[in-house]
């Protein structure tokens, strides 16, 4: 919001307001506070003073509450994703889809760790120079995680649509190579955007920042569309295909993950794309904090989805080790009576990619 009613929003002004949304500061560079302050415009303060401080106190309480909730859910999600990383990295054989899940858990873990520090610093108002660095890591981790979900959906769709090609002609180490490229591209895109928009070491360049934002927008739109197209194609193949394809646990895991991401993960990306255009509107800061909290919920929900789907057996919840639950959640063959694996499950688990 402008400091005065007559203040215009040129490129520089827009940039400073845009930055203030991320740094928990007002447009003058100071932290939001409930200390003694007066409105920046000339008006009869005796009339508006009480309403001004009441509104300001309400905003600060809401602000701190959202940050505290985000930090809390981030701590829980960090533990869950750390468990998935430990199991997939040290206790289970790696195969095509487990590599994607491992990298998705890594991106979520990085995001949640950084978000915990970021939210606590906003609440406790630590005045340090690490906010730009934290913001860069947050967006980098979000982009990386955003890449993994379309990759999982696309590869699953390929395995259903062209099973012979997938099992016979698919290059080895495809999953690891794709994940490495996604990490590298996400880092490069984030560094370019951060450098041009003044988040890193360079000065703010309005036109270069707009150019990088346009590239990021196009990239995110592609990532938003791919999971839905892949899931729709896979669902069509399962329902309308000439050969009946059984629904496995991994189908359910993918479907639930994409569904949760749609409601909890997409909003923060959409709002981030719209921020430069809606930054002048009142209340946009709290919208951004809410969608940030929702994405933290999404990152926290992924391990819960894996373990919950793995624990359901014959329509009943069963208590088993976390390793077994995670293996069941990624089981890509129909479950047989007595819990015996299908003939292709063992070969899939031994496929190192």
Curated annotation (Swiss-Prot):
Location of region: Disordered: 333-353
PROSITE patterns: G_PROTEIN_RECEP_F1_1, G_PROTEIN_RECEP_F1_2
Keyword Cell cycle: no
Extracellular side: 1-67, 118-131, 202-213, 275-289
CDD domains: 7tmA_MrgprB
Glycosylation site residues: 26, 44
Membrane topology, Cytoplasmic segments: 91-96, 153-180, 235-253, 311-353
Membrane topology label: Multi-pass membrane protein
Matches recorded under InterPro entries: GPCR_Rhodpsn (IPR000276), GPCR_Rhodpsn_7TM (IPR017452), MRGPCRFAMILY (IPR026234)
Expressing tissues: Expressed strongly in newborn dorsal root ganglia, adult dorsal root ganglia and trigeminal ganlia.
Protein's job: Orphan receptor. Probably involved in the function of nociceptive neurons. May regulate nociceptor function and/or development, including the sensation or modulation of pain.
Designated name of the protein: Mas-related G-protein coupled receptor member B5
Record organism: Rattus norvegicus
